[in-house]
Amino acid sequence: WFRADEGLAFMLQYENVAWYDAGEVRILDRRIYPAKIEFVRCKTHVEVMQAIRDMVTQSAGPYTAAAMGMALAAYECREKSADEQLAYLQAADETISNARPTTYKRMKLVCDGCLAAAKLALREGRPVDLAIREHAVNANNRRYSKVNEIAKYLVPLIPDGGTVMTQCFGETIVGMMLKEAKQSGKTFRLFCPETRPYFQGARLTATVCHDMGFDVTVITDNMPAFVMEREHVDLFTCAADAICLDGYVVNKVGTLQIAICANHFGIPTFVTGAPDIGHETKDTVKIEMRDPEFTLQAMGVRTAAQGVKGYYPAFDMTPPHLISGIVTDRGVFSPFDLHRYFAGGG
């Protein structure tokens, strides 16, 4: 059984992202990893949706969780007629897809794929939950393999012995970038901004880098400019929650200011991922506003006085003039020429 997660860090292995088995989905709680290794156990697809909304898993984790949630929904309705099962799964598709507004279109593609697998299983009389899980694993294999192709275009852009700055947690591309670098005999060091308020850079990106044997340093979110100036950063790279066809990149809030700093110091910014055909322009993206209370604390410890207000946009938009290239599985594209990515019929 081919597994594209082979050789990657613990938290990037499929079962340690999200996994369905016997009427339950377990999701690694990335809010507390690596201090604690705990899994949130969901007994219904609605609980999976809520776990995604509550940031139990982040970056690309929600897409795996969503697929496993669809398998769980199939288990929930297994005693119903075929027509009733299909109706139940269509409703679950909408529920899970709407977990977070900014990523709705990508999430809908994932859930629709699970729905198609369910329809085929119903026609063939196979267990629908297992068919969806098999589809989810195959989809993960395809995605990981696709990201591995992205890594093959990204790693040559990094000087051997150089310095890379990241942002938030790019999930699979972080692991694949490091795996590809090791296979090609290239070494570099990484600076990871901590990424408040959930500290994904400090807890997730830095842990993956360390687990895979790389020199990694965590910095606070207000240090990128200083570090770029003093530590000879060669490249800033991040993944994206959406890459609009007009060249705007939607990613974890803070990406814009790092790209501005990189531009100021003449450091290239490379964004990894495929353009989103569902987002012709940035105007089709809804920026999620989350509970502002989270900006008034750090890992559960209150840092601001009672009565002080918080402000918490989950994402920001980086304009194309700040981006040196979009690194895809088909090569590196100018952010001003993303329609060319689809010229091959993809």
Could you tell me what each predicted segment is?
Residues 106-160, 186-188, 192-236:
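Ligand-binding beta-strand-loop-alpha-helix segment within the catalytic cores
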Residues 173-183, 259:
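Histidine-anchored nucleotide/phosphate-binding helix
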